[in-house]
Amino acid sequence: MSEKIAIAISGAAGRMGRRLIALGSAEGNLKIAAAWDTPSHPDFGADSGQLAGVGSNGVPIRSITDDQTPVDVIIDFSTPAATDELIAQALKRRSALVYATTGAAAEQMEALRQAAKTIPVLWSPSMSMTVNLTMLLAQTAARALADKDADVEIIEKHHRFKADAPSGTALKFGRLIAEEMGIDGAVFGREGKTGARPHNQIGYHAVRIGDNPGEHTILFGLLGETIELTVKATNRDAYAVGALRCAEFLAGKPAGEIYTMNDVLNL
């Protein structure tokens, strides 16, 4: 696309929204055209550039239903409570949608799949490029260990403000590994007299601490040896940069199936 890609940030007043505005403002081929959040947010109405610490950009934080600014791509880092209206607005505007919110209900994911038939939609439980590369490594390990009676445990760490557990990324790791190894059992934390660990099970463990932006460790344990894959984000910019790359990728793409980070990274 020869002109700048017009971007709308949904959840613009939040921590991720501010980083998206700050980093997106520095991208030569992107333009922050709209910034949306709920009217109840204390920073509603503020200049989004000033809120993001990059100076006034003339784009105030507004409601998605009140702001009719035309945009090429919407990046959503809000909450599942906003998803239904978000999808409706994206369809109404014929805007591409990068959906980065976690914790969506099954019916909301189905609504995204239906929307993808009309507009370009990209969804990933993590916008981090290194997380998605680590998923590929985990799949490779799972495939190699599928018949070796390996135990699989997933440990994820996030900041104290994260509202869902385990993380969508941890669950995606688990789904990919389960498919490769034929595992259909799961346990979320353990306590008490649990007995011997069954092989046909993936264990999930969620840690909520401080301002940790995200860390995932995948353990494949055999008798006498263990593989440990760990991917860490050192700050939120890892997710913001990934989401902006997704927006650049999605602009101008045809509708059809939901795109993922694998498409962006050519995996």
For each feature predicted by the language model, list its residue ranges:
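Rossmann-fold NAD(P)-binding glycine/threonine-rich loop
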Residues: 84-88, 101-123, 132, 137-139
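Rossmann-fold NAD(P) dinucleotide-binding segment
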Residues: 65-73, 77-100, 111
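Residue-level detector of alpha-helix initiation sites
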Residues: 14-15, 81, 128
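Structural motif
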Residues: 10, 77-78, 100-101, 124, ...
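Rossmann-like NAD(P)H-binding beta-loop-alpha module
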Residues: 133-149, 165
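C-terminal substrate-binding/catalytic lobe of Rossmann-fold NAD(P)-dependent oxidoreductases
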Residues: 6-67, 149-267
